[in-house]
Regions:
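N-terminal, polar/charged subdomain of small-to-medium soluble alpha/beta proteins
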Residues: 1-108, 114-126, 130-161
Length: 161
């Protein structure tokens, strides 16, 4: 499943609207591309990268798998980004979430925010990751070092059926 992506201008109360991009993808996240975000007017460029860690709740994790209905997840991710743009003075905000099989250390989510000021960039980034954790319809299945696996609580009420 390839990323569909969306680039939408969002009114933020300023004469120049914020540009928003939300993507769900099976492809590795190119974090270096996200560092090109923003313009010369931006004093802050913040990049948050969430990575697959080797443990969770006392268990050794070997890898994990994210599953999602990509179109629905992208719509919700875009809504989250729009909310962040409305709340914070940012000029560009982009988020990418992986699906598929991920190994330890791989980027599972990336959020890039460009803003004239650092406080707004930090606020927007924090808002986006917290809302992703609460609301994004993406399911996670952890594979453990002992050979077992389990669905892990995600934003929705349960694993895909």
């Amino acid at each position: 499943m390839k990323a569909t992506g969306d680039r939408t201008k969002v009114p933020t109360g300023d004469p120049d609207p914020c540009s928003v991009s939300a993507r769900i993808t099976e492809e590795p996240i190119q974090t270096d591309r996200l560092l090109d975000l923003g313009s010369r007017a931006d004093g802050a460029l913040l990049l948050f990268v969430g990575r697959v860690r080797d443990h969770n709740e006392g268990r050794s994790v070997a890898r994990l798998r994210y599953e999602a209905y990509a179109e629905m997840a992208e719509r919700e991710l875009e809504a989250i980004l729009r909310e962040a743009a409305d709340r914070c003075e940012v000029t560009r905000i982009e988020a990418v979430h992986r699906t598929g099989e991920l190994e330890i250390g791989e980027a599972s989510v990336a959020i890039a925010v460009a803003s004239p000021h650092r406080a707004a960039a930090f606020e927007a980034s924090r808002y986006v990751i917290e809302e992703i954790k609460k609301r994004l319809p993406v399911w996670k299945r952890e594979a453990y070092a002992d050979g077992s696996d389990a669905w892990v609580r995600a934003a929705s009420d349960g694993p895909p059926r």
